[in-house]
């Protein structure tokens, strides 16, 4: 896979936090930032404005990540990864980020925002 620049990784992590907060099942393995980045890499072009439409590969990654984010600790870790990387990225379109789960058929029961407190993610 091509090496992702920090802007691309941050955009992927922003999207990851959104997806990870919605799963409710328990899992035994911890989710890693590497897994998040890998699943969401196809979404980077869309959420940074380099693509006008969301790709099937992006939605596949979002749905796959939703399946991996089964425990509260996994979702909290992903949220923290997102915040540590995404705060330095200014070109992310949060309107597009917040719309990705819905466009991919994944339901998020709360507003998507960079102000999300990762400690409150369940």
UniProtKB/Swiss-Prot annotation:
Q: As annotated in Swiss-Prot or TrEMBL, what is the tissue specificity of this protein? A: Expressed in phloem. Also detected in the epidermis near the vascular tissues in resistant plants infected by Hessian fly larvae.
Q: What induces it?
A: Up-regulated by Hessian fly larval infestation, salicylic acid, ethylene, H(2)O(2) and wounding. Not induced by methyl jasmonate.
User: Which range is the signal sequence, renumbered to this chain?
Assistant: 1-29
Q: Which cysteines are joined by disulfide bonds?
A: 33-81, 43-58, 59-104, 79-118
Q: Which domain of life is it from?
A: Eukaryota
Regions crossing the membrane: none
Could you tell me one molecular function GO term of this UniProt entry? lipid binding
Q: Which PANTHER family match?
A: NON-SPECIFIC LIPID-TRANSFER PROTEIN 2-RELATED (PTHR33076)
- Function of this protein? Plant non-specific lipid-transfer proteins transfer phospholipids as well as galactolipids across membranes. May play a role in wax or cutin deposition in the cell walls of expanding epidermal cells and certain secretory tissues.
Q: Name it.
A: Probable non-specific lipid-transfer protein 3
Q: Gene behind this chain?
A: LTP3
């Amino acid at each position: 896979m091509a090496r992702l620049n920090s802007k691309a990784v941050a955009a992927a992590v922003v999207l990851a936090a959104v997806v990870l907060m919605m799963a409710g099942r328990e899992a035994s393995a911890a989710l890693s930032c590497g897994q998040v980045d890998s699943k969401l890499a196809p979404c980077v072009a869309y959420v940074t404005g380099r693509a006008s439409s969301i790709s099937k590969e992006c939605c596949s990654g979002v749905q796959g990540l939703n399946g991996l984010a089964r425990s509260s600790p996994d979702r909290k870790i992903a949220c923290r990864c997102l915040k540590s990387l995404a705060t330095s990225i200014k070109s992310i379109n949060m309107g597009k980020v917040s719309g990705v789960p819905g466009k991919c058929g994944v339901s998020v029961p709360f507003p998507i925002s960079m102000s999300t407190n990762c400690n409150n993610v369940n």
